[in-house]
Structures are given as structure tokens and as C-alpha cells.
A protein has these predicted regions:
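Alpha-helical interface subdomain recognition
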Residues: 1-97
Length: 97
């Protein structure tokens, strides 16, 4: 979990540095959003597994965080949209009209 957390933090930090320098490509934002939300969901799932049955109770905040992340995945732009944007970057073919 710590590895994924630190990778996500470094990616967010680097995107912030690029933005401050005026060098941020909007497609890089798709990389950050897609990666960091996916990793956060994976961390929540791992935490839920570690806690066993307690992971689904209100005694621990794991399910609340997982539910919040599911909504973030939706309002930040679905992972499919970010995947299409990144596919265009890699192939040069427009996937969105």
C-alpha cells in the first residue's frame, strides 16, 4: 500500500510542478487522474481485505473511502474516457468525436 501511495503522491507533485511552470499538457492530467484513482481504489480494496469482515463495517472508514473513490472515478471523468485520451496520445488516432 505504501508503494502505491508514494507513487501517486509523486505523480501528483510532478503534475503540480509542470502546471506551475506552464508546461503541463492536459493529456498528462488524464494519466494522473486515471492512475491515482485506480491506485486509491486498489489500496482501499487491500485495506478491506486486511481487515477481513471488519472492513465492511462502519467501525472502520474503508468502505466510506471506497464509496467516495467510486464517485470520484465518475465525476473526474470515467476511466474509459481517460483511456481513450491516452490511446490517442500513443497512436495518434482520434477516438473521440
Amino acid at each position: 500500500m505504501m508503494l502505491e501511495l508514494q507513487k501517486a503522491q509523486l505523480l501528483a507533485w510532478r503534475l503540480g510542478v509542470l502546471k506551475d511552470a506552464g508546461e503541463l499538457d492536459p493529456r498528462q492530467i488524464s494519466v494522473g487522474k486515471l492512475n491515482n484513482v485506480r491506485e486509491a481504489l486498489d489500496v482501499c480494496r487491500e485495506a478491506r481485505t486486511i481487515l477481513g469482515a471488519n472492513g465492511i463495517t462502519s467501525e472502520y472508514p474503508v468502505m466510506r473511502h471506497a464509496n467516495n473513490l467510486e464517485s470520484v472515478l465518475t465525476y473526474e471523468g470515467t476511466s474509459e474516457i481517460h483511456t481513450l485520451i491516452l490511446g490517442e496520445v500513443l497512436t495518434g488516432e482520434r477516438a473521440l468525436a
